[in-house]
């Protein structure tokens, strides 16, 4: 898999971008990971790439994906921020935050 100019998770915005999710869906096709990202992409489109609800299994799949697949594609700091956010989501309401909970 080649590196993309887009990243699937923006630490500064604390969310997925629909374009990056689209890239990952294309990269993984009809595999379980591809289906997961297709589901997330659909949810992002319904909400205009704002907030997206993730189930515990989806969060678990994303943690697996970071640990086993994309760790070589992205900077370590981005992945650490990503995993911290996923850890918080496991114990919080299942909403992918558009911005920091303290913002605004």
Model-identified regions with their sequence ranges:
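Positively charged, low-complexity terminal tracts
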Residues: 1-104
């Amino acid at each position: 898999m080649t590196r993309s100019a887009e990243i699937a998770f923006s630490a500064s915005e604390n969310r997925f971008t629909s374009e990056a999710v689209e890239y990952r869906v294309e990269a993984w096709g009809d595999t379980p990971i591809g289906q997961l990202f297709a589901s997330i992409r659909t949810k992002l489109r319904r909400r205009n790439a704002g907030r997206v609800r993730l189930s515990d299994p989806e969060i678990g799949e994303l943690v697996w994906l970071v640990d086993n697949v994309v760790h070589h594609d992205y900077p370590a700091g981005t992945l650490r921020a990503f995993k911290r956010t996923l850890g918080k989501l496991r114990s919080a309401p299942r909403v992918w935050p558009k911005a920091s909970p303290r913002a605004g």
